[in-house]
Amino acid sequence: MFCPILFCDNLVKLFDDEVELSVLRQTSIHNFSELHIEQFDKFDKVKGSLINCMVEKVGLYKTQFKDICFPPTLKFEPIKIKRYLPGGYFDWHVDVTGHTSMSRYLAFFIYLTDNEEGKTRFLNTAVDCKKGSMVIFPPMWPWVHRGEPPIETPKYIVGSYLHYNSPAWGAPNYMWSEYGRN
């Protein structure tokens, strides 16, 4: 477990308290609601803890690969919380699809709820949706993945990406979190 259970429960509550301000992403390939936590002051207290969860885990990669090719500074894309209602989904895709997302090099999902059906499925494996657990993977081909639909209860996840450099798509600098040169 990478994030404490009570911390996950608190994030779900914070999302639900602001759900009317969430953005519904509903197309033929996905159906979920999301919030960018940087847009809400009430998330300021938890943002640091979320980043710490991610930095701690990515530190294992950074230690192993720093002399080979790991970027010296961690630049996180703005953190989003997503809610998939029963039947919600994100069909097969990759998270680097062109110029606007090409600087992403690692994807992070932290599962905020337990959900037997709401797995993250890759072509040859699947990751269970277990509260407090995290999955990290490259966001480009061939790590094609999908968010399987929860059946009985909503699925909540936190997501972000590490970037090689400044955002190609023009997000304001205040929305970016930068950590260390260690």
PLM segments and residue spans:
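Non-heme Fe(II)/2-oxoglutarate
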Residues: 1-73, 179
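A generic fold-level signal
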Residues: 6, 73-76, 100-103, 129, ...
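Acidic, glycine-rich loop-and-strand cores that form catalytic or ligand-binding grooves
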Residues: 71-85
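Short beta-strand or tight-loop elements
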Residues: 77, 88-90, 104, 143
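Short, conserved beta-strand element in jelly-roll/cupin
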Residues: 81-85, 98-116, 161-164
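Histidine-centered catalytic micro-motifs
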Residues: 89-97
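Catalytic core of Fe(II)/2-oxoglutarate
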Residues: 104, 115-182
